[in-house]
Amino acid sequence: LWMVSEGGTDIIDLTTLKPTVPRDAKGVLKNILNQPAVHVMKDSKGCIWLHCANKLNRIVFNEKGDVETVSTLDLVVLNGPNIALQDIDEDGKIWAGINGEILKVDWDSQGKLTTTPIAECLKFEPGTYISDFLMKENEVWISTDRGLFRYNKSGNIVKRYEHDPNNPRSLSQNYLTDLSITNDKQLIIATLRGVNIYNPMTDDFECIASGDFQNGSSNLLNSNFINCILTEEDHICLGT
């Protein structure tokens, strides 16, 4: 279990529930783990991607679980509290939201990390914070602090969704913090003004929120400031 915080990265052995550090013959990992970190993920190939100290690290393990190589991409500066990382293509080459743009992170023959823009249409306004993206059918949904974007990979086109004060079926706010998909393929969008559920039949949203800022709102939430969401079977867990 890998956990990141301002104090660094902690690794817990779930069989003993004690701290552990994978064997690393080159001794590179220890220094990385001591740096303040904001995001960690595992890709489809079993590699760990760790963002810390404005750097993105790819940690590769051998069959014994020992560290084989550590590759680093420098100057990965955040535009917000976190960084969006996802193995969208399930090839181990992750998509990353960096400096208002979505890039694919690859590596060369020497193991050095390189980046390539996914598409020209996925370059956003300067300073845009990309909080998350996920794959749903053949489209990638992208949450930002400036609305929701729907990218069709086949057609290489983007559609943007924004809050409209005159439309109660629009997004409840443009600052989006997280995305998730339920078992029945519903897209859930977390914002700092409640939760939005996308309706593909009408191409709009239903809002769940506390208070009376929108007609039909309820007191289902203890706060409208949603930081993260997790869907599990028929349940939606909200962190506020």
Locate predicted features:
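Carboxylate-rich, polar loop motifs that coordinate divalent cations or form catalytic acidic clusters
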Residues: L1-T240
